[in-house]
Amino acid sequence: MEKFQGYLEFDGARQQSFLYPLFFREYIYVLAYDHGLNRLNRNRSIFLENADYDKKYSSLIVKRLILRMYEQNRLIIPTKDLNQNNFLGHTSLFYYQMISVLFAVIVEIPFSLRLGSSFEGNLFKKSYNLQSIHSIFPFLEDKLSHFNYVLDVVIPYPIHLEILVQTLRYRVKDASSLHFLRFCVYEYFNCKNFYIKKKSILNPRFFLFLYNSHVCEYESIFFFLRKRSSHLRSTSYEVLFERIFFYGKIQHFFKVFVNNFPAILGLLKDPFIHYVRYHGRSILATKDTPLLMNKWKYYFVNLWQCYFSVWFQSQKVHIKQLSKDNLEFLGYLSSLRLNPLVVRSQMLENSFLIDNVRIKLDSKIPISSIIGSLAKDKFCNVLGHPISKVIWTHSSDSDILNRFVRICRNISHYYSGSSKKKFLYRIKYILRLCCVKTLARKHKSTVRAFLKRLGSGLLEEFLTGEDQVLSLIFPISYYASKRLYRVRIWYLDILYLNDLANHE
């Protein structure tokens, strides 16, 4: 691996050639199947681990396919021969899928090596907790309480895949690999037009790499402006919107600023900015004025449209005032709550009452969206009335009960950071009654007769689990009080959003 690592290293200027020649080298098989590389990444590749891909994709088949394509001296296969033109028992659609899978694995090799070297020893153990979704909420509670405005941006998806390929030109200097990438993408979708399947296997790893490259280029420009502006505390953002003649504009601005506008120095100071990206959205939190927030909105719209050729509507950028509006963030509704405090101060014989206001970030449970998800998965109707889960009636009673209990515990576990947990009672009620109706439907009985026959102890597991964990964390006296249901608990083992559809 040390021999390959030197070959795959990136230099600081990012002027390296791409990894396209690795398709024709024998030791790519060693790299693709080396377990040490996967341990560096801590996440084994879909190409190597997924059972559906293990039996189908092979770098050896890819090499044979490429050699065959060059021997035929034609890369475009006629559409009428799609069914007849088989290679190793597969059709042409499979060829481009297979090449794109291996292509995604290869381009991730240098990133895996770089990531592995940065997390050596105990550094990876310390950073593992930071992977939890809940780890960001304590940070937001500490930082957002000092800010007043948030820019909620929906990152646009390119309509055409050619835009994604063109984005790679800024980082990839090997023209042959870009042509090969473009060829695979176009031929893959040309085959899809004639090979329509209800459940066709796409390559999420390949398109995720293209999308991340697209977003990374956008963020590099944004961070460039942010980094430059952080060293110019008296410079307006208005000057930083364009990259052309950047330093010339800064120098000219200083001349105008010193001569004519010394009184507005405080208004143009660069505030602190926090940037968070998640699930195709980004948040820009700052303590700006409404005028500067509108300028940031104008900047994002023009950046996507002019620089990336992506149509971006201004309606996708929302300016929210945290004291008035709710911010939808990772399944929570977050907003700033003002807690008035009255402090009595006594000095000698005189006493004073001091009114103080404490700003706190409040994270609430979006009860309507959760009920909507439950209704989508047929646990209840759109009004929140429980219905039986007909598709589960063929399972055993213990299996049905375990599924409902698992979903209920996952929801309680994820929304433990809310200060108002009473909304969870309604979710638990829907799941409990849905479970009873499902079991009663399976046994061809009514809900009343089913509960009378088995007793209420059947649903005790819905009331335990999360409560048992809380009883171990807090003292008994504190646990018995009602204050426990107002305490926020952030767990460091939640690595993904709980999807109600993922209940199998």
From Swiss-Prot:
GO biological-process terms attached to the record: mRNA processing; RNA splicing; tRNA processing
Keywords noted in UniProt: Chloroplast, mRNA processing, Plastid, RNA-binding, tRNA processing
Role: Usually encoded in the trnK tRNA gene intron. Probably assists in splicing its own and other chloroplast group II introns.
Gene name for this UniProt entry: matK
Keyword Endoplasmic reticulum recorded: no
Pfam families with a match to the protein in the record: Intron_maturas2, MatK_N
Name of the protein: Maturase K
Alphabetized InterPro entries for the sequence: Domain_X, Maturase_MatK, Maturase_MatK_N
Cellular localisation: Plastid, Chloroplast
Any one of the GO CC terms: chloroplast
Family to which the UniProt record says this protein belongs: Belongs to the intron maturase 2 family. MatK subfamily.
Predominant location: plastid
Coiled coil: none
Annotated GO MF terms: RNA binding
